[in-house]
Amino acid sequence: MMNSNLVPFDPYYKKRITYVWRGQQFAFDVAHTIFSSFQIDEGTDLLLRLIEPAFSEPQRILDVGCGCGVIGICLARRFPQADVTLVDKDLLAVRYARHNAELNATTNVTVLGSVGLSEAPPGPYDLIVSNIPAKIGDYAIEHEFILEPLRHLRPGGEYWFVVVSGLNHLIPRLGPRHNLRLKEIKKRAGHSVYRIIAPAATMPTGGL
C-alpha cells in the first residue's frame, strides 16, 4: 500500500517514477539533481532482478549509496522481517529516500546521511547491496565500496553490487588482489552484477 498524497512535497521535486518488481508496484519521487531522475537506472533494475541472497530471511540489510532509495526499499518490501538501513552522502538523496520509504509504506527502513559507511550502524549485516558510483575514482571504489562493506558482513554474508561496464577493468582484479570470493553474476551491455561472499571467519583487511 502506498501513500499517494505527498506530491509535490518540496521545491526540489521533479516527478514520480513507478516501478514494478516481483509483481508489486512501487513509486519513487525524485529530484532534479539525484542520480537517475528520469527513470529507474538500468543497473539498479538488473541488480534487483538478479539478487537471490543465500539467507532466505535476512535480518539486517544495508544499501550503500542509496540515492532515492530504490534498491533498499524494494528489498524492505520483499523481506519485511528485516531491519533495512539505507545510507548516502548526499543529504537531498537522504531526504528523498526517507520520503520514498514512507510513500511505499516500508516501515522497516532507516535512512542515514553517511560518507561511505562512516555513520552506518555497526554490523554485522546479512546482506549489503550497492549500485556503485562510477566517477569517484578507482581507489575510493576499492576501499569505500568494496573492502569497507565486507568488514560489515556477517560470516557467510553476501554483498551484491552493480557497476557500469567502464569499471570492469577494476572489479575483476580485486578478487585475487584481496583474496575475495568474488563472482560475476551477469554482464550485459552497460552493466555487470557481482557478488562477494564473506569468509566464514576473517574479513579481508584491505589496509590503506
Language-model features: where?
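Conserved SAM/SAH cofactor-binding pocket of Class I
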Residues: 43-121, 130
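Conserved beta-strand signature within the Rossmann-like core of class I S-adenosyl-L-methionine
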Residues: 156-163
